[in-house]
Amino acid sequence: MAKKIVAVIKLALQAGKANPAPPVGPALGQHGVNIMAFCKEYNAKTQDKAGFVIPVEISVFEDRSFTFITKTPPAAVLITKAAGIDKGSGESSKGSVGNISKAQLEEIAKTKLPDLNCSSVESAMKVIEGTARNMGVSITD
């Protein structure tokens, strides 16, 4: 018989830099999970993606064991890195804070495709383009 899931915890952590300090410690500690075991596994799995924030979904079972799934970095983070800016515009309708090319947009869309509710790269590009537009980043040919 399959183990029963008692909690699903969603966190966004720096790749390769998870430690028992908040937010990891309190979130996992209240469910009785071995925090250091999670930190070691997460850091090993994400060390090649250093510099990115990687969302993770942790399933905690009734025997206090756990499994986790890492997601792709948020689209906003990928867009700001591609555009070379610190953050998006507070008022996206008033002007552009940066540019990304169609090729960069396609690369981001291919990266995000597994986590998006899209079946093709073209539809994923439209989703990412909308995110970029809302951040005040323009798309150039």
Swiss-Prot record:
It comes from the Bacteria. It comes from Prochlorococcus marinus (strain MIT 9312). GO terms for molecular function: large ribosomal subunit rRNA binding; structural constituent of ribosome. Part of the ribosomal stalk of the 50S ribosomal subunit. Interacts with L10 and the large rRNA to form the base of the stalk. L10 forms an elongated spine to which L12 dimers bind in a sequential fashion forming a multimeric L10(L12)X complex. The gene is rplK. GO terms for cellular component: cytosolic large ribosomal subunit. GO terms for biological process: translation. Belongs to the universal ribosomal protein uL11 family. This is Large ribosomal subunit protein uL11. Keywords: Methylation, Ribonucleoprotein, Ribosomal protein, RNA-binding, rRNA-binding.
